[in-house]
Amino acid sequence: TYMQMLRVVMPQVAGVRRAGAAALDLAYVAAGRVDGYWELGLLPWDTAAGALLVTEAGGHLSTVHGGEYQHGGDICAGTPRIHSAMVAAFAPLVAARPVGVKSAGTLRTAGDKANA
C-alpha cells in the first residue's frame, strides 16, 4: 500500500510530494524538479506524455517490480541514480501487494533545490 511504500522511502529522502496528475509528476521527473516517482493502477493516457518526457530527458522507467513499463498499471520513474534504488526498496512490498491497490508518490532527495 501507499503507506507501506512511504514508510520505506521517508527515512532515505528529503521529502515526498504528490502533484495530483501522473503526467505532471512525470514532467517534474523529466525536468529534474523531483528525482523519482511511483504510482500503481494507472491507465495508458495517464502517463503517455510524461513517460516520453522522462525517457527523452534520460530518466529510467519501469514497473514498480522493475519490469518493462507497458503504458498502464504500475510505474516507477526516476533519475538513473534513484530509479534502481526505488525498485529495490519497493521489491518486498510490491511482491505482497494485493491486485488493484492504488498508490502514488514523488521523491525529493536531500540535494533537491526545488522549493517545498
Model-found features: residue ranges?
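An extended, acidic
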Residues: 1-116
